[in-house]
Amino acid sequence: MECVMNSKKIIQLSTTQKIMLSFLCAILVGSFLLALPISSATGEAVPYIDALFTATTSICVTGLVTVPTYSTWSVWGQIVILFLIQLGGLGVITVMYGVMMGLHRRLGLGNRWMLQDVFNLNNISGIVKFLRKVLIGTLVVEGCGALLYMTVFVPGYGLRGIWISIFNAVSAFCNAGMDIMAEDSLCGYVFQPMVNLVTMLLIILGGLGYIVWWDVLRVLKNIRSQKLKCFRLLTLHSKIALTVTGILIVVGAAAFYIFEYNNPLTMQDYTVPQRIWASLFQAVTTRTAGFATIPQEDLTNTSAIISVLLMLIGGSPVGTAGGMKTVTIAVLLVSMFATIGNKEDAELFGRNIPKQAVNKSVAVVGMFFIIASLSTILLSAVTDADVIDIVYETVSATATVGLSRNLTSMLNLWGKLIIIVPMYLGRVGPISLVVAFSTQKKNKNIVKNPTEEISVG
């Protein structure tokens, strides 16, 4: 009888709890597998704290590493890491239901409601078809990316280049930023057009989100004339995501070009085209990808601060990227200017922004700053690194970016444990909690407390 009651309690877990529990279970299983001697390149078990850190950074698609991925882990260990990255990028529950579909098992109404919460959709109509598109689209994009990578990595690494290409394609699309080539990420390919272009495209596609994908494809499929009006046919969500993404890439690249132009440690000796490549890549990768073509510790303080801001913003909702999200920031800014202008409603692209969306945006931004601030305070208590390096590390962890100013590998036990927490919370907390709140029924109390004016600002 007690077992039946416990099973009912598990079934009655909210979507948020199931998401958080699924990621936690994946981390624990992944850390156990990585702690086995077979996962180590030397045949000796890696310390469990490093296995736990690697499992967390993989499933949370962060990319911060305490040990070199290419030299520490065996092929089996790298396969485990790649599986965790794919699992984290798509979402544990998404993959689980994808497997059920592959086994021809029917998804019940409860399963469809959960997928609605996971993808943050308005209804469950066509949810199974949407899931199928997500899974197939992911495999197609990653496969194309791997094939393009092979044109560079196979000539350079031989047959091993095939595995490197597959690993990098999945890691880039999932915005994980982990690679198995060298300690300095993609710094050796800073001037390689194919590697730069493919990596940036995979990062952007993964970061835009699946909703934007299918909305753009829908418009392109149905449009027959007046192509200049394609943008008008997109949903408000897609318009915001595409616009903010474009602005951040262009403005970010211009800022890095300006502030790194005379930096002797980075771009001073580069040609103009090389500076453009490096600046573009930095603007794209800081939006939660984690790959690097220039050493992050060599950036000027101004560029480091710009990188922190871009990391905080991150990608778009319902994608593989982390951060506060482009749409969240856009809604918050529009709402702020509406308040300043004494406007009753926040408007964007000729549409009013729902009050609920504004409230969610405030909640997401607030939670991110709380998590990042507490992590910064705690990490500064256990390490004597520079403040800019600590802030860079904690924001990178919270926004699941993976860029570091050479601090991750020097963390002690407490430092590693501190960084593990924001990586996990950044992946499941600010996102899934807001989704859960939006699906809960409001308490409509018959008696309401009186309202009283207060002074703010």
Task: State the predicted function of each range.
Residues 1-457:
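Membrane-proximal intracellular helices of multi-pass ion channels
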